[in-house]
A protein has these predicted regions:
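Core beta-strand-centered patch of the WYL/Sm-like small regulatory domain
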Residues: 13-126
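Proteolytic processing junctions in secreted/extracellular precursors
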Residues: 2-16
């Protein structure tokens, strides 16, 4: 018997397209997502600013974003990597975000793909 989470995951599981991510990056829109992490922990709603779209070492399409609020195991606010195939629901909020240094000193202007060990190929960035 499927539990409610599995049913919702099956109904809502439309992986986000790279076009949707590009649109959010180009327009600097905050997004609301539900994310299915590896261990099915923290699958609730998250508020994220998407900054970079690219491929991981394993060849998965992913985006690097700054998560301000929402469900997470590692706490917020924090920079995180989100695989597109694990995004269960994607909703642009139309709230714009400012590109400025974050509390850890990382900023979109200073992003260096060579220092991001998670993304090996960058397709788009703020």
């Amino acid at each position: 018997m499927l539990n409610l989470y599995e049913i919702l995951k099956e109904v809502l599981n439309e992986s986000v397209s790279s076009d949707s991510v590009n649109d959010a990056i180009n327009n600097k829109y905050r997004i609301l997502i539900n994310y299915d992490d590896e261990d099915n922990h923290a699958t609730g709603t998250r508020l994220v600013e998407p900054y970079v779209l690219g491929y991981t070492k394993a060849g998965n399409l992913a985006f690097r974003g700054y998560q301000y609020e929402g469900d997470t195991v590692r706490g917020v606010p924090k920079w995180k990597l989100f695989r597109l195939d694990r995004v269960i629901n994607w909703q642009p909020t139309k709230q714009k975000f400012n590109v400025e240094p974050k509390d850890n000193g990382w900023s979109a202007e200073s992003y260096n793909s060579n220092s991001d060990g998670s993304l090996t190929s960058i397709l788009n960035q703020v």
